[in-house]
């Protein structure tokens, strides 16, 4: 163990000088352990990660926890290896911090548990799997218009408060209940309250036994928020590579990963690039995203919530993330204001899996017809606002009539929101979703009032709701 001393503390960035010309490798973990000698001092147990070499014997590091109480001259020990976190069965049902330490008060992880470093190379080119398979989510708007790919990367885009986290919670619920798969949840720079709620909900629903959770929340220093996504990814990689599982990796929120990088970038002495972001933005994102993939042994399907600053999709952070994604689910504030939940924009959401050779001809044609109908309705809205419905041709009136039913039928109740709405959630298989929309497009339900289509699951529930409203079906 080689020792050094703290020579400078700049918020979350700490400079350390080592003896005898020793220089720890980039990404090595350094430890500072200090017992308080009087009441004015605090106990310190801090991990630093080497980020830069300054000269022959000095390194600049990023702290993984608060640097409160740190003083120049304190002793630092080089561990000789990167941060390593526990992997395997011991992680299931547990909650960890960025260093892989349990924070759920359920006891320590056994000393003999396997630990893997959080910095690892992406799988080799020849190890990657190429076949495309659809992952059924049970959420109609997703399955019909922007289906998710097994082993793909999916982005949930949206501004503040439009429902990204609720959608992620529903996906965790549906995939655990219907597919029995293992999930890893990485909470990156989001609200601690939401993480706590999610943990308790998953405990109550029994999903927690199939899930590992890692948190580096809003109140933590940028070092923890930068690395917590890698901690979660390392746990997911073990299940993929060693156990051949299809794993789900949820990251909420990938924007905070970029944001944390930009917070320390200037302190590390880098010149800022566009909009003040770090110049290494694309590289950092690429290193994370390239490890999330399908291999010959198993797959990691990643669902990432992406906060869009001020609803500006051209901002470098969301724009850089876009290039890595197979499918995008865009959440739209206008739809949330109309009471359509999930507030997914059916025209802006995309997926490379929406192709006849992947989803089948019928599904593809129904999805395209739904999008055409909604697009035409959007074009007609200005005319309706100025001249009213009466000025439309009969054909356009019919399009508006059906588009409104489609728009409402794209909404549904969520299992995870039952306690707020008082309505049971619904899981709709893809086959049922395609059949329901096909029948609406054919005009089979033109006589049913549009309110009957709001927040229901299968098309049969629409008919049932209409009967309760006293409509002849």
From Swiss-Prot:
UniProt-annotated binding residues for ATP: 158-165
Organism: Geobacillus sp. (strain WCH70)
Purpose: Produces ATP from ADP in the presence of a proton gradient across the membrane. The catalytic sites are hosted primarily by the beta subunits.
GO MF: ATP binding; ATP hydrolysis activity; proton-transporting ATP synthase activity, rotational mechanism
Name listed for the protein in its UniProt record: ATP synthase subunit beta
Subunit field text: F-type ATPases have 2 components, CF(1) - the catalytic core - and CF(0) - the membrane proton channel. CF(1) has five subunits: alpha(3), beta(3), gamma(1), delta(1), epsilon(1). CF(0) has three main subunits: a(1), b(2) and c(9-12). The alpha and beta chains form an alternating ring which encloses part of the gamma chain. CF(1) is attached to CF(0) by a central stalk formed by the gamma and epsilon chains, while a peripheral stalk is formed by the delta and b chains.
Subcellular location: Cell membrane
Highest taxon of source: Bacteria
Family listed: Belongs to the ATPase alpha/beta chains family.
Swiss-Prot/TrEMBL keywords: ATP synthesis, ATP-binding, Cell membrane, CF(1), Hydrogen ion transport, Ion transport, Membrane, Nucleotide-binding, Translocase, Transport
Top EC class for this record: translocase
Record bears the keyword Nucleotide-binding: yes
The keyword Nucleotide-binding is assigned to this record: yes
Gene3D superfamilies recorded: 2.40.10.170, Bovine Mitochondrial F1-atpase, Atp Synthase Beta Chain, Chain D, domain 3, P-loop containing nucleotide triphosphate hydrolases
Signal peptide: none
Lipid bilayer topology: Peripheral membrane protein
GO cellular component: plasma membrane; proton-transporting ATP synthase complex
PANTHER family per record: ATP SYNTHASE, ATP SYNTHASE SUBUNIT BETA, MITOCHONDRIAL
Catalytic activity, reaction form: ATP + H2O + 4 H(+)(in) = ADP + phosphate + 5 H(+)(out)
EC code(s) of this entry: 7.1.2.2
